Amino acid sequence: NVIKQRSLIIRSIRRFFEELYFIEVETPTLLSVNSGANAKPFTTHYNALGEDFFLRVAPELSLKKLLVGGMERIFEIGKNYRNEGMSKRHNPEFTSLEAYSAYTDCNSMIKVFMELVNHLSLSYDGPELKIEVISMKDLVRQAISGAEVTYENLNEVFEIYVAPFLINPTIVT
C-alpha cells in the first residue's frame, strides 16, 4: 500500500544520504519572519508572544545557516506549507527533500540527485534511468523555436509549452 511504500522510500533516502556522510537535520517550521521560496505562507497567531508567525514555505534559509555554521553535508526531509492554489501538481502541505554540501557546486549536487533517483529505482526493481540535464531556456527554445524568450517570461512559457510534455526523467537547470 502507499503508506508502506512511502515509508520504505524515505528510509532508502535516509540510508543513501547517510552513506555519503550527510547528516539529517530538522529545522523550524514555525517562523517569526517569512523566508525561503517566493510563495505565500500560512500565518498563525502565537498567543504566548502575542505575535503572528508563519509556517515555512521552504527550509532553504535555515539549512544554509547550518552550512555557514560549519555543517558541511546536511539534508532534511520535512513538511512545507504554501497558502496558494491546489491542483494535481500542487498541494498546500507537502514533504520535501533538501540537501546541501559545502565546497561543491550545482553540478556536484545534480550528480548526487541523479545517483539518488537511480538508487531508488533500482531498490524497487526498476530500471537504471537515463536522466537528461538541460536548461529551462534550451527546453523552451526547442518547444517554440523562433519565439523570443526573455527572463521575465521564461517560467510562464516553460509551464505552458514544456512542463506538460516532459515525460522522461529530466533535471531542468
Where are the predicted features?
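Class II aminoacyl-tRNA synthetase-like tRNA-binding/catalytic domains
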Residues: 1-107, 118, 148-152, 169
